Amino acid sequence: MIGELTAALGIRDKLFLATKVWTRGKENGIKSMERSMTLLRAKQIDLMQVHNLVDVQTQLATLREWKAQGRIRYLGITHYEAGAFADVEKIMRSEKLDFVQINYSLMEREAEASILPLAQERGIAVIVNRPFGGGDLFSRARSKPLPDWAAEFGCRSWAQFFLKWIVANSAVTCAIPATNKPHHLEENLQAGAGPLPDGKMRQRMAELVSSL
């Protein structure tokens, strides 16, 4: 669908296309990535990621080849559990990565210990998944009013509150909240507009969520 839409609208040059490979074996990896390129109708993918570190060394070897050939612009790895951070960190230290995608939220802050500082040190861009803690943050905030002081940094909803806390971290490049509702998508996008909370305000936000 994305490939059809970008082709029909002629907007490929305005998009950053990112996808992933999630299989074992070199040939299977190549088939998976070529299928993604076909579906996206793209001669070049901006970012290809080894998802959940599956056969990571094999797939990274292919990604390095593809990057040299110009078939992808950037390469990276992903995981969605803090339990994998030790392995993620090892790869960040041993491989030349452009991106790392990890879970990080007001309820899952383990990435602050080593992953985020290391990403800044090595110049690795960070994509945040599970920015709402798998929905647990909304469960905490349900029926709770958004604090008046959230307006100081342009927040009009809890979703924007949670997202702005994340993207205000200087180590974070972007967050990717999942949704299948257009009005939620529009609301989430607004978190990237306007002012962001500073360090003191982020601490205040974290303390509030901890008290919910």
Predicted regions and their residues:
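Structured C-terminal cap/extension of enzyme domains
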Residues: 94-99, 114-212
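Short, solvent-exposed turn/loop segments enriched in Gly/Ser/Thr/Pro and often Arg
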Residues: 1, 78-81, 132
